[in-house]
From Swiss-Prot:
Gene: hslU
Swiss-Prot/TrEMBL keywords: ATP-binding, Chaperone, Cytoplasm, Nucleotide-binding
Classification lineage: Bacteria, Pseudomonadati, Pseudomonadota, Gammaproteobacteria, Vibrionales
Superkingdom of source: Bacteria
Signal peptide segment: none
Name the record gives this protein: ATP-dependent protease ATPase subunit HslU
Chain's role: ATPase subunit of a proteasome-like degradation complex; this subunit has chaperone activity. The binding of ATP and its subsequent hydrolysis by HslU are essential for unfolding of protein substrates subsequently hydrolyzed by HslV. HslU recognizes the N-terminal part of its protein substrates and unfolds these before they are guided to HslV for hydrolysis.
Entry GO terms, CC: HslUV protease complex
Main subcellular location: cytoplasm
């Protein structure tokens, strides 16, 4: 779990996302509150529930990007889902409880990787011994007991040194390794994923643990044996318990496109993929117990962050009970021409950096001038204003159109240099931007 302060979290988000300070502050505080809660005494910790967040803002302003970056910063079980993928319990489609099952799978995988990392050094030592045994089988007496001889020990040390220096990497040896589990792949009907997982687990258990002789290069054998030895050192039951504890106390669920499950107008009949899904989300967000293949998971202290553009629907169109369970509202602002200019240059691995690096692979140099970047930003903003406003995503469309000719001819123009200035942008995009009908279809 991340121990970063809210200021550090915002600073890290600023490296990738331009603007939206209110949203960054809200998620930073929510993330820090997870850590604060874990410092409390048990009796008080149980009473502190997370303050769930609803992010409201037009498309392409950074809602989903905040979620993606938060996942990397959180160092906690995190899952992002689309609200439109679910249907009400009892109908064909995914039930909302699969969110918690998937989150638990993420936590188990994450905890497993951490546990394997902790025992990595011991596992590599044991793998090294097994490889040395294969290279230098120990001498045995007439009773079958291993004999300890001085010269054998010295030879073993020489081989150990060579092994560590990588001199034996390409030598092939024959070793016993655990046979890969041949899992039976079963296509799950919608809503029956849990039953399918249980069936697959049953088929895998029938195979049991079998050893198989394989001829491998020493560097590949080292990797395979280290993984096998690490798996022996990890207690799977303790690992599952730790993963469930991590989900229950640090888990974060990001629900995107929540505005798409609002009820629109007066309609008769069951609304299984809209209001029905909202009703099913209520117990998850409020706190309930979900059965997973790893054990029972309580959702009382899982943090839920929902987001939506709310261009057609309004937050008040959500059912009142769900509105009450998302107490923190954050509005994200539409992006300006100046924001677009900053997006093109300031973030780590910005769009301009990406195109420069891509063309560099063909030995073509690209240089974006200040006035060229300003013109690109203005072009994207103008098209957004005159047609549909799709936010920063418009920059991808404009940049692709701008770089189209250079990208196509780059392989034949090795060593060339192109300067993308205002005049170049105007020449490539000017007519398209000024003609509203053209920009509607091309940009």
């Amino acid at each position: 779990m991340s121990e970063m302060t809210p200021r550090e979290i915002v600073h890290e988000l600023n490296r990738h996302i331009i603007g939206q300070d209110k949203a960054k502050r809200s998620v930073a505080i929510a993330l820090r509150n997870r850590w604060r809660r874990m410092q409390l005494e048990e009796s008080l910790r149980v009473e502190v529930t997370p303050k769930n967040i609803l992010m409201i803002g037009p498309t392409g302003v950074g809602k989903t990007e905040i979620a993606r970056r938060l996942a990397k910063l959180a160092n906690a079980p995190f899952i992002k889902v689309e609200a439109t993928k679910f249907t009400e319990v009892g109908y064909v489609g995914k039930e909302v409880e699969t969110i918690i099952r998937d989150l638990t799978d993420v936590a188990v995988k994450m905890t497993h990787q951490q546990a394997m990392e902790k025992v990595k050094f011991r596992a590599e030592e044991q793998a090294e011994e097994r490889i040395l045994d294969a290279l230098l089988p120990p001498a045995r007496d007439s009773w079958g007991q291993v004999e300890q001889k001085e010269d054998t020990s010295n030879t073993r040390q020489i081989f150990r040194k060579k092994l560590r220096e990588g001199q034996l990497d390409d030598k092939e040896i024959e070793i016993d390794v655990a046979a890969p589990q041949m899992g039976v792949e079963i296509m799950a009907p919608p809503g029956m994923e849990e039953m399918t997982n249980q069936l697959q687990g049953m088929f895998q258990n029938l195979a049991g643990d079998t050893k198989k002789k394989r001829k491998l290069k020493i560097k590949d054998a080292m990797k395979a044996l280290a993984e096998e030895e690490a798996a022996k050192l990890v207690n799977q039951e303790e690992l599952k318990e730790a993963a469930i504890f991590n989900v229950e106390n640090n888990g974060i669920v990001f629900i995107d496109e929540i505005d798409k499950i609002c009820k629109r107008g007066e309609s008769s009949g069951p609304d299984v993929s809209r209001e029905g899904v909202q009703r099913d989300l209520l117990p998850l967000i409020e706190g309930s117990t979900v059965s997973t293949k790893h054990g029972m998971v309580k959702t009382d202290h899982i943090l839920f962050v929902a987001s939506g553009a709310f261009q057609v629907a309004k937050p008040s169109d959500l059912i009142p009970e769900l509105q009450g369970r998302l107490p923190i509202r954050v509005e994200l602002e539409a992006l300006s021409s100046n924001d677009f200019k900053r997006i093109l240059t300031e973030p780590k691995a910005s769009l301009t950096e990406q195109y420069i690096a891509l063309m560099k692979t063909e030995d073509v140099d690209i240089e974006f001038t200040e006035d060229g970047i300003t013109r690109i930003a203005e072009a994207a903003w103008t098209v957004n204003e005159t047609t549909e406003n799709i936010g920063a995503r418009r920059l991808h469309t404009v940049m692709e159109r701008l770089m189209d000719e250079i990208s196509y001819d780059a392989a034949e123009q090795s060593g060339a240099k192109f300067v993308i200035d205002a005049a170049y942008v105007q020449a490539r995009l000017g007519d398209t931007i000024e003609d509203e009908d053209l920009s509607r279809f091309i940009l």
